[in-house]
Structures are given as C-alpha cells and as structure tokens.
Amino acid sequence: MKRFFTLALFLTLYVLSLKAQSSDNGDGTFTNPVIWADCPDPDVIRVGEDFYFVSTTMHLMPGAPVMHSKDLVNWEIVSYIFDRIEETPRYSLQEGTVYGRGQWATSLRYHNGRFYAYFTPNDQPYKGYVYTTEDPRGKWELHSVIPHFHDASFFFDEDGRAYMVYGTGMIRELKPDLTGVLEGGLDTKLFERDKEENNLLEGSRMIKKDGRYYLLMISWPRGGIRREVCYRADRIEGPYEKKVILETPFGGLGDGVAQGTIFDDPQGNWYGMFFQDRGGVGRVPHLMPCTWIDGWPMLGDKDGKVPEIMEKPVQGQERKALTVSDEFDTEALGLCW
C-alpha cells in the first residue's frame, strides 16, 4: 500500500510539474504566454508541417537556440546555430565581459532547400554572421561574415534577389550567394517615420503576400506602450503606408506585446508570435491569431486583444516543455543546457 501511495504521489507531482512547465492545458487549448521562459526576439517559420522558432541568448553560448513544434504550443530545442563567438576575448571573460550583449535578434529563413540564419552581436566585433544548414536538427555551418545590420530580417524575393531589411526602415541588397552586399544593388531608406514614431522603431520582419510587401516592426512611442506596426507597399522600394496592428497590454501589466513575426499553417490560417517584457522573468512569447482585414495583418482576437486562453492551432500533439528535469546520467549534456 505504501509503495502504491508513493507511486501515485510521484505520478501526480510529475503531471503537475509538466502542466506548470507547459502552456498546453490538455483540453485542446493553451494559455498565454505560450512559453513561460525568456525567449526574446522571436522569429518563426513553417516548412511543410513543421514550425521552427529561433530566439536570443545574448552572452550565453552555445547561442541562438532553434526550437521545433508541430502545433506552435509544444516546443523542444533541436539545435543551436553557433557554438562560440571568438573574434574578441571578452566572450571568454578576458579583457572584460559582454553580459547582456552578444547575439541578438536572429532572422531565420528557408530558401531553396536550405535554412539560413543571420544575427549580429550587439557589441564588438560589430559584424553579421550568416549560418546555414539543410537539417535544422543538425550542425549549422558558418556561411559568411557580412556587415552589421541592426535587428535585421532576411528577405528572399520571388525573383531570386536577396535583401537585408534593418534598422528603422533601411534595406540593403545582398549578393546572390549571401557573401556580402551587392555593389550597385538596392540600398535605401524605405520610409520616413512619422511624428507619432518618436522613439523605438526596430525589430524588422519582412514577408510577401499576394504580391505585397509587409514590414513588421516594434514601436514604442514616448508615453505609450510597446506595440506592433506594419508598413506595406506594392513594390519593395515603396512607397509604404503604415498601420498599427497590435497595441494592447496583457496579463495586468502595463507593457504591451510586440516584436516578432507572422506566419501561416498548412491550412492557410495565420498566427503571430510576439514577446512581452516580464522583467526578471525575461521576454516571454505570446501566440495569437492574425486576421487579414483589408490587406492588413491584424493581430489578436476580434477586439485586438491577446487571448489569454486560445484553441491550439493543431490538435493531438504530445505535450512538451522547454524546461526539463535532468539526472545528468548520460554522456552528453542535454540541449536545454
């Protein structure tokens, strides 16, 4: 009887622990934040029926974790894009430190059968790194070192041309082999910010839908909350028009939900993944619907709010959590470390 009670108690605690670590409610719904962990600057892409999510690790290495999911709710780490940054001794705690700096805001794309990732250290050596792989669960290879582009978004157009969209509406065309900038290629500012955009405006993510170009950015006007804005144009060089697509607090906190990206599922439904700054907890991602209204990707529910509880986009997937218990009884550390 004692043994049975002990086993029952263990199973109960295990289930409760898993529930606490996962946003999956077990009834076909999930609760936002979809990941209760520090996963800043999310970029999410879909390849077939698989979703991939890359985030920021700053000074921690290996860096730029790649996560995989079948339902956008249950995620697992499958690889890291890079092992170390070696161009400055500060990344090895020599001649100073890089705490709070390092790798920021990776852009993840799938193009012609390969995955590409671009990131810049928010510190020396002020370069940009392009990594690539055919298998996101395997090893990523350094493809090229190109200029530093702040909070950049890779963009591959249908005509084969490649671009980097970065900063506050800047764009630079790249060589077709992604080894540097294309001399004589497109190099311009896509728009001038209006008077309402009087503070932070960054976190570029560009997509193309139905022949239109959409540039999503985080905006943080003075005296306001973080919000997401969208610039759209019929030509990549513009002219662009702007619309606020998400501006709402969440969870009783005064800060808004913004900076991330939008994507579709195999059935053509659209979603957004954007973070909210939770202070010491970090920047936690929230999953929400994205509804196209008059050619604009409007985020949140019908009232423009981030839903607290939402139906999972895909049903029937195994519940998983990024945070795990580890007995350290294997030869290699788990990817969570």
Question: Language model features by range: what are they?
Answer:
Residues 1-22:
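Bacterial Sec-dependent N-terminal signal peptides
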